[in-house]
UniProtKB/Swiss-Prot annotation:
This is Phosphatidylethanolamine N-methyltransferase. The gene is CHO2. Belongs to the class VI-like SAM-binding methyltransferase superfamily. CHO2 family. Pfam families: PEMT (PF04191). Gene3D superfamilies: 1.20.120.1630, 2.60.40.2840. Catalyzes the first step of the methylation pathway of phosphatidylcholine biosynthesis, the SAM-dependent methylation of phosphatidylethanolamine (PE) to phosphatidylmonomethylethanolamine (PMME). It is found in: Endoplasmic reticulum membrane. InterPro entries: Phopholipid_MeTrfase, Phosphatid-EA_MeTrfase_fun. The keyword Phosphoprotein does not apply. One of its GO terms (molecular function) is phosphatidylethanolamine N-methyltransferase activity. Its EC number is 2.1.1.17. The chain crosses the membrane at residues 52-72, 76-96, 151-171, 180-200, 228-248, 259-279, 331-351, 355-375, 447-467, 469-489, 532-552. It catalyses: a 1,2-diacyl-sn-glycero-3-phosphoethanolamine + S-adenosyl-L-methionine = a 1,2-diacyl-sn-glycero-3-phospho-N-methylethanolamine + S-adenosyl-L-homocysteine + H(+).
Length: 890
């Protein structure tokens, strides 16, 4: 982030002055100033006493380096560098902190001018060297304070750099005691880092000029410097002068091959971040506005509050954030982490391979579950629908509040995602600790200290990035909230586009780069001792790519549009293009990236279409289709067969009897009965002799298609004798009732399958006429389907009693009266309760549950049915469910 400046005020161009404004409100022209190097070393620029003292101190550093014993150089310059680095980050930090809070440096200067003495003379001499007489009279004391402060900054920063470079030279003795290839690689990378550092610093100074370089906004404001903007290297990384602006440190460590240089570089860099966090950032927030009070941050916080209100509070993140001792889920997560990361550590070394395999299996399993949930939720709202099935059908009051239902289902998802994430990283911790404890090869690894340092930095990088991501997109974004929740009514004006603040300004998908840093850090640390860490790293990386390209990206395009998702240029991309890449190279990269995106999109569409087709065909429909196709294949094989014996058997079937379906329905060239409707069949036999005890069975055609001359499977009780009097000793009295055998003549008759003689499973069926108490087939009916009749569910907000009763009566006549004849009406509470709770009726209740779910297009549980007082109340619940499902699928 940089301060916008439309005027140049520190270089000789057509506009030498810009307006400044003190915190007291005084307006003044800002005189021209010069950068640090030019102020000290350009002979055309007038020098002050402090400039000569600074140059002298630099020569003293060189003299100390030259004359100090070789064995003393490193410790001497460690001390000197530490002194100047602390002078920078601690000394300047304290001065700026006090200046920000109470303008203390301004008051000190005023006090010096009042008290007089050598300090006043020194300040006047310093100012007269930097400003002419006219400028001295026109600029306010705040600007004069800044000029004096610049001299102190020049002293500290130049000595900080010089002592660091002296330390680098002192530690360079072992820079060339390696193989030529490694030396070449180290120096190429080191020089590249150093040059990159110089480019970043120069570009940063070109943009922010002396005003920001010397913390001018601690002393006064520029009139045209009202807000923070992003430009140049400030698009490349957050706070580039303090982050990537220290790449040269690590380049020097590479060139010298010195752990001392590396550790001191990390030390200096860490102090710089502390300076940024405790000095600069609070002042930036004070002057330019707090990031936490920005429009995006406020919107993100409001959205999180809206989503998690009434659901137990904000969910746990990474074991510590939002932890609540009174929430069982949080305690469970911590116990899970402790159990998975500590208990396995104390198992014998012989368990190493088993634990590693378990970690891989856990990662594959949890990834499959999470990815499947996200994919199906994006396409079909499957997670929310499942939640409605298991919770909404029990608590009907929730069906009046779509937002609450979505929030509750989302809360359950956050628990699943967080626990699986904790479990996976706990397992990684376990196998890493066991590798250190039990694998002797690990301690023989080359460059082990360097590996430890780099691994720690990579893990820290992922940790900090995750926090920045959560700060930018909130818990809602971290947990893929827009997969589960639409725009909240209380939040319609908030966060309706993708967030481009924080880390998302620099990277479109920071998780693509940073979410796998930990596993690759472990690979870097352990790859010499155990190659399985490469498999683990690749597994995590592949899963990340699958989620981003095949699940998250298509969903984001669907919600926010292709232009906003695929065509947006990140800050890093813009900066690299403008600073390092020619136009023709940029064009080639754009084309290549577009080609890769197209391949990914095409692959995603193919997978999406395949799964969508499978999902849209319900299991029952697939089963019916499979069975019907199987039957047709069997018939075609039979008809096309040249087997003489088979032909004779078929002819015998036609001659011995016939079965004619009487009340068959037909639609779209398909013969069918509605589930529960009686099936009437007329039978005929020319030769009745010896067949008095013939019977007709009802079979699923998929089970009987293997043979046409003999039935090899049980009828499962779905059968009727053709003559009532021939089965007088039949224990099953239902088959002796008159509603089963409607007509009974010698050579013909009519029977009816109804009530418990009907299968309550949709499918393709046939009727078979069998010989006396045997399974030899005399005749077979043509195949027909038994289907569930679809009943329109009223879903309007103002559904009245009349429409509700009409709907309930359709359910009663279509299904309930056939399964539970004792229930007399839709408001019969006593018989409904009795029938629903009789143990012997459990199977009938399950049939009703399945049938109503298919007929009404909702997912009902057995508990959802038995908990209602009567059928009318159940109908009202189904109406509410259907309305909720329709709203979710919009």
């Amino acid at each position: 982030m940089v301060k916008e400046s439309k005027f140049s005020y520190n270089s000789k161009d057509e506009k030498k002055y810009s307006l400044g404004k003190t915190f007291r409100g005084d307006i003044f022209n800002v005189p021209e100033t010069h950068d640090m190097v030019r102020s000290l070393f350009d002979p055309t620029v007038k020098k002050s006493v402090s400039d000569y003292l600074i140059v002298l101190s630099l020569f003293i550093n060189g003299i100390v380096y030259y004359y100090s014993p070789v064995t003393w150089r490193i410790p001497v310059f460690i001390v000197l560098y530490s002194f100047w680095r602390l002078g920078y980050n601690l000394g300047i930090g304290i001065l700026l902190y006090k200046q920000s809070k109470s303008h203390s440096m301004f008051h000190w200067l005023k006090q010096i001018q009042i008290n007089g003495g050598w300090a006043k003379k020194f300040v006047e001499l310093e100012l007269s060297s930097k400003l002419n007489a006219q400028q001295l009279n026109s600029v306010p004391d705040e600007f004069k304070t800044w000029i004096v402060f610049r001299s102190l900054v020049n002293l500290i920063l130049m000595n900080d750099f010089t002592t660091y470079m002296c330390l680098v030279f002192a530690c360079s003795d072992g820079a060339f005691n390696q193989s030529l290839s490694l030396i070449f690689l180290r120096w190429v990378l080191g020089i590249s880092f150093f040059i990159f550092n110089i480019i970043v610093k120069l570009n940063a100074h070109l943009i922010v000029k002396d005003y920001a370089w010397y913390w001018g906004d601690f002393f006064f404001r520029l009139h045209n410097n009202e807000e923070l903007i992003f430009d140049g290297v400030f698009d490349l990384a957050p706070h580039p002068m303090y982050s990537i602006g220290y790449a040269g440190y690590y380049g020097c460590a590479l060139m010298t091959k010195s752990y001392t240089v590396l550790i001191m570089s990390i030390f200096g860099h860490l102090l710089q971040f502390l300076f940024l966090n405790y000095v600069e950032t609070p002042h930036i927030e004070k002057i330019y506005g707090d990031d936490n009070l920005s429009e995006n941050t406020i919107s993100v916080n409001k959205r999180d509050d809206s989503v998690f209100i009434g659901t137990g509070g904000k969910p746990l993140v990474m074991l510590t954030k939002n932890f609540n001792w009174l929430r069982t889920n949080d305690i469970f997560t911590v116990v899970l982490a402790l159990y998975a990361s500590i208990v396995p550590i104390f198992l014998p070394a012989s368990y190493n391979n088993s634990i590693i395999i378990l970690a891989i299996v856990v990662k594959i399993g949890t990834s499959f579950v999470l990815n499947s949930v996200l994919y199906l939720q994006s396409r079909f709202k499957s997670w929310t629908l499942s939640f409605i099935k298991n919770y909404g059908t029990i608590n009907i009051s929730i069906l009046d509040n779509k937002e609450l239902l979505e929030r509750l289902s989302f809360q359950n998802w956050t628990l699943l995602q967080n626990n699986t994430l904790v479990l996976n990283y706990s397992m990684l911790f376990t196998i890493s600790v066991r590798e250190v404890m039990y694998n002797e090869k690990f301690w023989q690894t080359e460059w082990l200290p360097l590996r430890f340092i780099l691994a720690a930095l990579m893990i820290l990088g992922q940790f900090l990035t995750v926090h920045q991501m959560i700060d930018s997109i909130g818990l809602f974004g971290w947990y893929y909230g827009d997969f589960f929740i639409g725009v909240l009514s209380s939040h319609k004006s908030e966060v309706t586009t993708l967030s481009r603040s924080g880390i998302y300004h620099f990277l479109n998908n920071p998780e693509r780069v940073t979410s796998n840093l930990t596993v690759w850090a472990l690979y870097l640390l352990f790859n010499n001792s155990n190659k399985i860490f490469l498999v683990i790293a690749l597994l995590f990386t592949m899963n990340n790519l699958i989620v981003l390209n095949f699940i998250e990206k298509p969903h984001m395009v669907k919600l926010y549009g292709e232009q906003n998702v695929l065509k947006h240029t990140s800050g890093i991309e813009k900066s690299i293009n403008s600073l390092f890449l020619p136009n023709h190279v940029q064009g080639t990269i754009v084309k290549l990236s577009g080609s890769i995106d197209k391949v990914i999109q095409d692959s995603s569409k193919v997978i999406d279409e395949f799964i969508r087709n499978k999902h849209n065909q319900k299991p029952k429909e697939l089963s019916l289709k499979k069975r019907r196709n199987s039957f047709q294949q069997v018939i075609e094989l039979i008809r096309g067969s040249t087997d003489d014996t088979l032909t004779i058997n078929l002819q015998e079937l036609n001659d011995q009897g016939q079965l004619q379906l009487l009340n068959l329905l037909r639609k779209d060239d398909t013969d069918f009965y509605n589930l529960g409707d009686p099936i009437k069949v007329e039978w005929n036999m020319e030769d009745h002799k010896g067949k008095d005890k013939a019977w007709i069975g009802l079979y699923n055609i998929f089970q009987t298609s293997e043979t046409r001359t003999k039935t090899l499977v049980s009828s499962k009780g779905y059968w009727i004798p053709i003559h009532r009097e021939k089965y007088i000793n039949l224990s099953d009295k239902i088959r002796n009732e008159e509603d089963c055998i409607l007509e009974d003549e010698l050579n013909r008759g009519v029977v009816q399958f109804s009530a418990e003689l009907l299968p309550w499973v949709p499918g393709t069926y046939e009727l078979r006429l069998h010989a006396n108490e045997k399974h030899e087939v005399l005749a077979i009916s043509k195949p027909f389907d038994i289907v569930v009749k679809k009943i329109d569910v009223p879903t309007s907000d103002d559904i009245g009693d009349e429409r509700l009763e009409d709907f309930a009566n359709k359910l009663y006549q279509g299904f309930v009266s056939k399964l539970f004849p004792a229930v007399e009406s839709i408001e019969d509470e006593s018989n409904w309760f009795l029938q629903m709770h009789i143990k012997e009726n459990a199977r009938q209740v399950e049939k009703l549950c399945s049938t109503l779910s298919q007929s009404c297009g909702v997912h009902l549980t057995k508990k959802a049915i038995v908990d209602e007082k009567c059928l009318k109340d159940l109908s009202f619940k189904i109406s509410k469910l259907r309305k909720m499902l329709d709203e979710l699928m919009l």
